[in-house]
Amino acid sequence: NGFDAVLVEGWNEGWEDWTAYTKNRQFSFTSPYPDFDVDELQRYAHEKGVRVMMHHETSANAADYERQLDDAFKFMVNHGYNAVKTGYVGPIIPRCEYHASQWMNNHYIHVAKRAADFNIMVNSHEAVRPTGLCRTYPNWLAQESARGTEFESMGGNPVDHTTILPFTRLMGGPMDYTPGIFQGDLSYYENGYKKDQQARTTLARQLALYCTMYSPLQMAADLPENYERFIDAFQFIKDVAVDWDESRYLEAEPGDYITVARRAKGTNNWFVG
């Protein structure tokens, strides 16, 4: 499908009780599970012309992550990774250090700077709202830093959410909103665990997000079989650019609607969402 990379989560030791938030040392960022063959996966991906993106979920244990940071980045370089998605789900450890505290702001910057030393790109989730530092650290390509698509499976986002974010969250930098959900019936996932739950979205809305939610890193967040059901819509995801020469906000009423047109870099191709 021409995708540049695949993100693999859950590869490393520590996921058995990662939401307990009781350990000072939770994950190992250099120890894959026995059934995860790092070198074989990289070989296969390289054969297909696809990169594998690393995932570092910290379970909000930022201090433990910092202790392992250099070893984690060395592991990435030694095994052919050049991009990482970081995660900070849960209450911050050490205690009393909150996601938006000075300590954590310094941590996010420290991770970006050390990643740059190893020529590694960073996409940080559950991080503080950005303030333009992606221009200081261009390897800090994107951040989540607001309720993204994943919250559609956890009670849902307000329907006006994505008409407000371009005027609030996105003022500070690119957002990895993780759009691309084609199956809105949540009972389809997790063996029907979320029975009778429906995501507050539509197929057209999911496609529009690739234009309205600016990020030079975009994700196709659904299962492959759901994309196979809507080949024409999936073609838009494959065609839409992530790097733009021109952006025009044609009309908007925060909380009601927004229309954005962008011209793909080096072309006369316009995309409207």
For each predicted feature, which ranges?
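Acidic/polar loop patches that form or flank catalytic/metal-binding clefts of enzymes
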Residues: 7-8, 119-126, 152-154, 218-230, ...
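Functionally critical loop-and-helix segments that line ligand-binding/catalytic clefts
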Residues: 1, 181-183, 229
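Extended hydrophobic/aromatic segments used for targeting, binding, or gating
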Residues: 30-45, 242-255, 273
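Catalytic cores of secreted or luminal carbohydrate-active enzymes
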Residues: 204-253
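An acidic-aromatic substrate-binding cleft motif
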Residues: 1, 5, 9
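Aromatic- and carboxylate-enriched substrate-binding clefts and catalytic-loop regions
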Residues: 10-198
